Amino acid sequence: MEKYENIKQVGEGAFGQVYKSRRTSDGAVFAIKKMPVDRETGFPFTAIREIKLCKSVINKHIIGLDEIVFEEGFIFVVLEYMPYDLTGLLASGAKLSTDQIRSITSQLIEAVSSMHGMGLVHRDIKPSNILLDCHGMLKLTDFGLTREISGMMTNRVCTLWYRAPELLLGETSYSLKVDAWSVGCIMLEMRLGRPPYRGSDEVSQIKLIFEELGIPQDKYKWSDLLDVDIYSKSRSTEEIIAERYGHLFDEEELKVLSGFLCLTSRKRLSVANSRYFTVISSHKNTYIPLSFEEAHELYTKERKETKKP
């Protein structure tokens, strides 16, 4: 990778590291994802999925792939560089305006809809995978868990705080609507300034959701293990959300939010259909500049570590 020089590390995960890097020939800046190639298993399957998705989905809100380089036991995936991810932005204390939040929501819905239109489910939509540039343009990234919808799939997907109830309850035959739940959680997080449901494991996560919203109308694989009936509510999800969050959203936004956070997956609002709400469609091509310092999840974590006594 002699033609690039690393500026700083901006991300890390089970896959490897992400660096902000400069191409020496022209000074262009990229994000380079560095992943080890296992001698026995070979090319990482998550990398195959990500590369395939970036090449197949042509949408301005999907991160762009520039090139792929193999070198010294590693694969380097060269992507567009974005100065913000939503986790870092929110954790940095940046105050997003109502219009900025609506713009981000609308763009995220467009990105996810483009995937769903091809029968692809992301399965790991979370703030750190939502990237933004200084103009307010959003790009969705990290497609290592993305796949085509089929009959039986693993339920061990999606970061815990953004995982749909049916996945937490053991469902293996699920739909694109698992992504809709994640989008709803992010809508709420941008207004609250924190993730709405922060469990420490699958059981505590589903209990937090049930305690606030009630229970699904359908039974899933593990429903009986949790005695879910004790969490039954007399009011609908729409009524509960309107009462709890009516001060944060207007009436139409509340309909979208309660649609995404519907516990019964077959009745949940699809991401594609949410585009027909005026509050979403009216912000479709609206980009509001961000004037904050660069902020990524890794930088935010490091700052928290340095503040510890």
From Swiss-Prot:
One of its GO terms (biological process) is cell division. The keyword Ion transport does not apply. It is found in: Nucleus. May play a role in the control of the eukaryotic cell cycle. Residues 4-288 form the Protein kinase domain. Keywords: ATP-binding, Cell cycle, Cell division, Kinase, Mitosis, Nucleotide-binding, Nucleus, Serine/threonine-protein kinase, Transferase. Its main location: nucleus. ATP binds at residues 10-18, 33. This is Probable cell division protein kinase ECU11_1290. Its EC number is 2.7.11.22. Belongs to the protein kinase superfamily. CMGC Ser/Thr protein kinase family. CDC2/CDKX subfamily. InterPro entries: CDK (IPR050108), Kinase-like_dom_sf (IPR011009), Prot_kinase_dom (IPR000719), Protein_kinase_ATP_BS (IPR017441), Ser/Thr_kinase_AS (IPR008271). Disulfide bonds: none annotated. The active site is at 124 (proton acceptor). It catalyses: L-seryl-[protein] + ATP = O-phospho-L-seryl-[protein] + ADP + H(+); L-threonyl-[protein] + ATP = O-phospho-L-threonyl-[protein] + ADP + H(+). One of its GO terms (molecular function) is cyclin-dependent protein serine/threonine kinase activity. PROSITE patterns: PROTEIN_KINASE_ATP, PROTEIN_KINASE_DOM, PROTEIN_KINASE_ST. GO terms for cellular component: cyclin-dependent protein kinase holoenzyme complex; nucleus.
